[in-house]
């Protein structure tokens, strides 16, 4: 015959056994890598340290840059509620692009520098681009913590410079800054 004390001990023992079974069945899964892997490129130029941290989107057989329907043109980012039409390029001409994937690309410099002859103060900036067929706008924006270009605000631009694209004869599968 079991006593209350024996019954309590038996219940406790069963609880321990069942807890052990439950704990051992919960397996730790390794984190799944992002589709667009994060990368950082850093360079010392003179005494200035410059780095770009970005996520590397892949082409995956898609058209990267090109024309979009005229009703979604302008300097509104794709991320502002516009849905990419089927078979449309990932980054349309004339739209703000995060210059990577996932979070906005981060540009960091430890000294005041000149970019295309224009001053940029030392600091961290989100790095965006507005691609065009013949000319691109490079944007250094003071909001360095934004996701993509969802909340891009042109009034926070520290610097905008224009540049001419130089197209490579062969393409890379992943975005790469060097």
Please name every model-derived segment.
Residues 2, 6, 25-121, 126-178:
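Targeting-peptide/extracellular-domain and disordered-appendage signature
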Residues 10-20:
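Bacterial N-terminal signal peptides
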């Amino acid at each position: 015959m079991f006593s209350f004390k024996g019954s309590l001990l038996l219940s406790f023992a069963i609880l321990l056994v069942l807890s052990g079974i439950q704990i051992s069945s919960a397996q730790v899964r390794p984190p799944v890598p992002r589709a667009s892997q994060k990368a950082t490129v850093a360079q010392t130029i003179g005494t200035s340290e410059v780095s770009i941290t970005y996520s590397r989107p892949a082409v995956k057989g898609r058209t990267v840059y090109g024309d979009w329907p005229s009703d979604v043109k302008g300097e509104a980012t794709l991320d502002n509620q516009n849905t990419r039409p089927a078979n449309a390029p990932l980054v349309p001409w004339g739209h703000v692009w995060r210059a990577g994937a996932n979070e906005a690309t981060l540009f960091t410099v430890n000294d005041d520098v000149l970019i295309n002859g224009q001053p940029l103060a030392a600091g961290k900036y989100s790095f965006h681009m507005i691609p065009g067929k013949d000319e691109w706008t490079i944007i250094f924006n003071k909001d360095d913590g934004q996701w993509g270009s969802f909340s891009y605000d042109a009034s926070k631009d520290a610097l905008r410079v224009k540049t001419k694209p130089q197209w490579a004869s062969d393409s890379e599968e992943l975005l790469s800054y060097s």
